[in-house]
From Swiss-Prot:
Biological processes annotated in GO: translation
GO MF: structural constituent of ribosome
Record-linked Pfam families: Ribosomal_L32p
GO cellular component terms, A-Z: large ribosomal subunit
Keywords: Ribonucleoprotein, Ribosomal protein
Name the UniProt record assigns to this protein: Large ribosomal subunit protein bL32
Gene: rpmF
InterPro entries in alphabetical order: Ribosomal_bL32, Ribosomal_bL32_bact, Ribosomal_zn-bd
Taxonomic placement: Bacteria, Pseudomonadati, Rhodothermota, Rhodothermia, Rhodothermales
Amino acid sequence: MAVPKRRHSKSRTRKRRSTYYNELEPPQLMECNNCGNPKVMHRACKHCGHYRGRQVIEPSDELIA
């Protein structure tokens, strides 16, 4: 198994690791069929609690305010 001959500096390591977050795409949003608010795809709506036409969670008052 290969072993590094010299240690990589902290800045070199951090530069390599930082590129991962630049390549991530923002989550895709869609309109909720029940209330019309934007929601993340394949997740229950935070505002009304519906997913695929059914009430799956109770909406909390904190998110609406």
